[in-house]
């Protein structure tokens, strides 16, 4: 009986630990150019990223491939979609939209020991891509 209780306790602790780890990505991050803040949030078990501050809030999504969206402001734009936690501080199977060029890329996110993110956008395989370092910050939305 003691072994069963011990096993169940360890199983529950391991499960809760894994769940907390997936949510470790949630927070606010400054982009490498320090001209935008990205808020990562969870919805229905997947992770998304939205621009909650931009240096020039009047900037429009003028490079969007959809002409109907080119008049939208970049502020508030969801640029990261559908990431799943894959363990080892990695979130995969998502996409990232780059409003500077209007292109959407496959994407993988890793978190370092300081809580910062390395966001790798790529086409096809992650070997052919670019990584940007986003710094975790405390930020209160206006």
Regions found by a protein language model. Name each.
Residues 116, 123-142:
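Edge beta-strand at a domain terminus
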Residues 26, 32-100, 104-106, 139:
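Central antiparallel beta-sheet cores of small beta-barrel/beta-sandwich binding domains
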Residues 99, 110, 124-125:
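Short polar/acidic secondary-structure junctions
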């Amino acid at each position: 009986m003691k072994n069963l209780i011990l096993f169940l306790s360890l199983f529950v602790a391991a499960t809760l630990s894994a769940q907390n780890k997936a949510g470790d990505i949630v927070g606010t991050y400054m982009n490498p150019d320090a001209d935008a803040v990205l808020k990562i949030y969870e919805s229905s078990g997947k992770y998304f990223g939205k621009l909650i501050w931009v240096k020039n809030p009047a900037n429009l999504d003028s490079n969007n491939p959809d002409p109907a969206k080119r008049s939208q402001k970049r502020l508030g734009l969801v640029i990261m979609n559908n990431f799943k936690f894959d363990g080892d501080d990695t979130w995969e199977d998502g996409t990232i939209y780059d409003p500077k060029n209007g292109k959407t890329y496959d994407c993988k996110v890793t978190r370092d020991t300081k809580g910062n993110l390395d966001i790798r956008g790529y086409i096809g395989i992650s070997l052919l891509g670019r990584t940007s370092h986003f710094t975790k910050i405390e930020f209160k939305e206006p």
